[in-house]
């Protein structure tokens, strides 16, 4: 890994709402990333189960963490709040009931850098009480033009509409926000905005 001071800042936006049973593992996995130059933005969206207090506790332990407490407004509004304060050249999103592999952002950063890309993507696991399985992993690296990426995204093949399995260049979100009070907000942002702007 390169010197942290020479690496671009990655802002990771994490909406948090009543996920105390999962939140500690989530935050540990983010704080433990091999890519160290992180700004970790936790948006406590009016939690009532102690999740907000746990966010504050982690912020006391790790100076890279910023916590914003707001009245419950939904995931889109929480992500928008994070976008408004994010300082990084690169953006990532993590759902607060998920955890990520220790080298996820190092891996995604090197994919961006080595391929001159605007967005990089990785596979993911689905973990249940019974089993864990890998989703959308061919074991191969692929590079897409903007047109190919949009077509693949719309056809729902190797690229999915999730925000949390990708790393984005910040400029893709200039003037872009998640639609509030709308289901499948990931699709609106992925197809309509960021992928159309990517090169």
Residue ranges and their predicted role:
Residues 1-197:
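Nucleotide-sugar donor-binding/catalytic module of glycosyltransferases
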